[in-house]
Design a protein with these regions (language model features):
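Hydrophobic membrane-insertion alpha-helices, especially the h-region
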Residues: 1-14
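Chitinase-like catalytic core of GlcNAc-active glycosidases
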Residues: 22-32, 57-172, 178
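Conserved, mostly hydrophobic/aromatic
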Residues: 54, 120, 176, 217, ...
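Aromatic-rich peripheral "rim/lid" segments of glycoside hydrolase catalytic domains that contact
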Residues: 75-80, 282-323, 336
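Substrate-binding surface in catalytic domains of secreted glycosidases
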Residues: 130-237, 241
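Substrate-binding cleft of secreted/luminal carbohydrate-active enzymes
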Residues: 218, 222-224, 228-305
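Asparagine-centered strand-capping/turn motif at beta-strand->loop junctions
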Residues: 318-335, 343-345
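Intrinsically disordered, low-complexity Pro/Gly/Ser/Thr-rich segments with frequent PxxP/GP/PP motifs
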Residues: 348-392
Length: 407
């Protein structure tokens, strides 16, 4: 598709701003608009580990009644001071109507954050790629000398890589990112859709490598949700958060698009792989629909994570009670599983109280422990209580095992 040597030479002659030919580091997007103590703790731990850069949502430009304003996340000020942090500014397509004015707004907003590592996130229509070039050129040209050395990144879609003027955009950047996931909204539930399409992914990786050796790839660690009206018509796509059922109109149907672990594994074992920026950083205790951190580490090492359910039985808080605990590993569970329970040598006498949406399989009998329990879906990697039991059995003698489907 592209002449690798000729294109690379042409781009190099234009002069890459950073003077770096290959981007080696991987990273995570931190896309929370409202930071909790858990988010801050996970971010600080990741910075302490020092293995990944973090790309933190630093502001979203919005237009209301023709007036532009920034909507920002409540990111703690100390986060912006770290040298592994890049501020991501999300701009609407409308910002490309006047690239010069938008460039000034980006520079001003970066100044309020005190950052000089920034990335632009814009869903650029193909016909406006030239305006995108004007925007990034304007930011670089107008960047204040005393604001620190600018490190400028920007996101691209696969459809951009074959456009002539994409080279002009790249010439003004330090860090280009190709987004390999996304869903084209279907008209109805009958149409097929996928979070990632294999053919598109590998075609984009080849094109990105041919264009510029500094590309990074953005990949999903997070599930997306499509909602459909009761008549089957498409309603809305949620790419950054999943509404609870009670937030949706009656009759709304949800379809969940989870990351394809087989395809992700194929990407990371391919010679076409690039440094990755995951969307997004998992936050234990706050993310129901995100793969766990360990899963992403395995993928980066070229290993295929195996989806399992771990079970633990421990002594309860009161004498004569036990807690049954489950933990989904390396998967974003959608339907839950059924677990068989072996209560050991003390027989089936006792009481069981299911929790967290779990339930007894079959009829619950007073004074008798269940032989199997339906385990509700839960956050990936998070241990959770399946239920509590009153029994004289030794917890060390009690075991749980996932039942095979159909048995």
């Amino acid at each position: 598709m592209f002449a690798v040597v000729a294109v690379f030479t042409a781009l190099w002659c234009l002069g890459h701003p950073s003077g770096v030919s290959v981007s080696a580091g991987s990273g995570f997007y931190v896309w929370q608009r409202h930071w909790s103590d858990k988010v801050e703790a996970v971010v600080c731990a990741e910075l302490e580990a020092g293995t990944h850069d973090l790309y933190v949502l630093g502001g979203e430009l919005e237009y209301e009644n023709g007036l532009a304003r920034w909507r920002g996340a409540n990111v703690p000020g100390h986060v912006w001071l770290h040298d592994r942090i890049t501020a991501v500014f999300r701009l609407p397509v409308q910002a490309l109507d006047n690239p010069g004015v938008s460039a000034a707004r980006v520079i001003s907003h970066a100044g309020t954050r005190g950052v000089h590592r920034i990335q632009l996130d814009v869903d650029v229509p193909e016909r406006m790629i030239g305006r995108y070039a004007e925007l990034v050129e304007g930011i670089r040209r107008r960047w204040p000398v005393g604001a620190g050395k600018l490190r400028l990144g920007a996101t691209f879609l696969p459809c951009h890589l074959g456009l002539k003027e994409v080279r002009r955009v790249l010439a003004a950047l330090d860090e280009p990112v190709i987004q390999l996931h996304g869903i084209d909204a279907p008209k109805n539930r009958v149409e097929t859709w996928a979070l990632m399409k294999r053919r598109t992914v590998f075609r984009a990786l080849r094109a990105a490598r041919a264009l510029d050796g500094r590309f990074k790839m953005a990949l999903p660690s997070y599930a997306y949700v499509l909602t459909f009206n009761a008549d089957g018509g498409f309603r809305r796509l949620y790419a950054e958060g999943l509404p609870d059922n009670f937030d949706l109109p009656p009759g709304t149907v949800r379809e969940i698009a989870v990351p394809d672990l087989d395809l992700l594994h194929e990407i990371f074992t391919s010679p076409l792989r690039l440094p990755v920026i995951w969307f997004r950083l998992p936050v234990r205790g706050a993310d129901r629909w995100c793969l766990e951190r360990e899963t992403l580490s395995l993928l980066e090492r070229g290993e295929r994570p195996r989806a399992t359910v771990e079970f633990t039985v421990r002594r309860g808080g009161r004498e004569g009670t036990v807690d049954l605990i489950a933990r989904y590993r390396h998967q974003i569970p959608l339907l839950g599983v059924t677990a068989a329970v072996d209560w050991g040598t003390c027989g089936m006498e006792g009481e069981f109280f299911p929790l967290n949406g779990c339930r007894v399989m079959g009829d619950a009998v007073h004074g008798q422990l269940p032989v199997s329990v339906s385990i509700a879906p839960f956050a990936c990697g998070e241990p959770f209580l399946v239920g509590k039991a009153i029994t004289g059995a030794d917890p060390r003698r009690i075991s749980m095992k996932e039942k095979e489907k159909g048995k």
